[in-house]
């Protein structure tokens, strides 16, 4: 998929770029796999703001994605490659031999007409899903489970990939996209290949309004707020922070401050921490 750049016909068009959507084969999703998606505006069930910079944006419908890939032994044919407004990756509609339809994350190189299958006996081919125990060392994988049967949780964004480095007893050693190397139960499943839409990270939003279409609200610096709104606020003109280190809006140290728990349960599975 290529990136289309605009001519600078206006300030908003200058440097703006979009995907050319060459891989997309239809603009009409499968209705049976749609679910309503209500906007929360970053609020929780008490109505309090828990995630800043969210709100507005174009209406969306949720596409129900099969992250578990548990339909073993039944071949499925790729019917369409579709855009999904809820994630950076594209999705593929799979028509299974028994008549069921499911969406999966579209790996790089997956095309309409390709036949995929899940299960321990599946071939090592892009789009097939297998337990880590059945995948050869060195294979590039994505959509990795952390608990058997829970569904893929790791490596799902556009262009991401992980690599299977080795197997030790009941665990497989996997290097994630962040650079972190960790053990994962070898009974957990993963899908072969790299997530598609690789050039997503090269897209330049170009103007503020396009962020608003996506439901992203402005990010205001703390130094331009009042002192009752932010620890950095107040003062005349461009005043310094006035504290030993930068603070979050709630007065906690930030920008380099370690927030991971000292004795977290998953520490014993992590061989090498992610890159800074």
UniProtKB/Swiss-Prot annotation:
GO-annotated molecular function: rRNA binding; structural constituent of ribosome; transferase activity
Region span, Disordered: 35-55, 222-276
Record-annotated disulphide pairs: none
Key words of the record: Ribonucleoprotein, Ribosomal protein, RNA-binding, rRNA-binding
GO biological process: cytoplasmic translation
Pfam families hit by this protein: Ribosomal_L2, Ribosomal_L2_C
Annotated GO CC locations: large ribosomal subunit
Coiled-coil parts of chain: none
Biased segments, Basic residues type: 258-276
UniProt entry tagged with the keyword Glycoprotein: no
Family the entry assigns: Belongs to the universal ribosomal protein uL2 family.
Function: One of the primary rRNA binding proteins. Required for association of the 30S and 50S subunits to form the 70S ribosome, for tRNA binding and peptide bond formation. It has been suggested to have peptidyltransferase activity; this is somewhat controversial. Makes several contacts with the 16S rRNA in the 70S ribosome.
Assembly, per entry: Part of the 50S ribosomal subunit. Forms a bridge to the 30S subunit in the 70S ribosome.
Protein name: Large ribosomal subunit protein uL2
């Amino acid at each position: 998929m290529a990136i289309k750049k605009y001519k600078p016909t206006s300030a908003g068009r200058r440097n703006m770029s979009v995907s050319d959507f060459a891989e997309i084969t239809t603009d009409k999703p499968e209705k049976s796999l749609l679910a309503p998606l209500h906007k929360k505006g970053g609020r929780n069930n008490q109505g309090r703001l828990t995630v800043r910079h969210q709100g507005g944006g174009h209406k969306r419908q949720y596409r129900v994605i099969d992250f578990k890939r548990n339909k073993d032994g039944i071949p499925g044919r790729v019917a369409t490659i579709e855009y999904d407004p809820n994630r950076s990756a594209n999705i593929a509609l799979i028509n299974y031999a028994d008549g069921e339809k499911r969406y999966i994350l579209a790996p790089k190189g997956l095309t309409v007409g390709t036949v995929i299958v899940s299960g321990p006996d599946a071939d090592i081919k892009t789009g097939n899903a297998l337990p880590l125990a059945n995948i050869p060392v060195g294979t590039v994988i994505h959509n990795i489970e952390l608990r058997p049967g829970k569904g893929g949780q790791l490596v799902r964004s556009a262009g991401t990939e992980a690599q299977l480095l080795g197997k030790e007893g009941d665990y497989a050693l996997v290097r994630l996209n962040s650079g972190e190397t960790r053990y994962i139960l070898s009974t957990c499943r993963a899908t072969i290949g790299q997530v598609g839409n690789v050039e997503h990270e090269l897209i330049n939003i170009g103007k503020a309004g396009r962020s608003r279409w996506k439901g992203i609200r402005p990010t205001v610096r703390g130094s331009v707020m009042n002192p009752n709104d932010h620890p950095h606020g107040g003062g005349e003109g461009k005043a310094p922070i006035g504290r030993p280190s930068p603070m979050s809006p709630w007065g906690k140290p930030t920008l380099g401050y370690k927030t991971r728990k000292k004795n977290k349960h998953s520490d014993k599975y992590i061989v090498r921490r992610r890159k800074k």
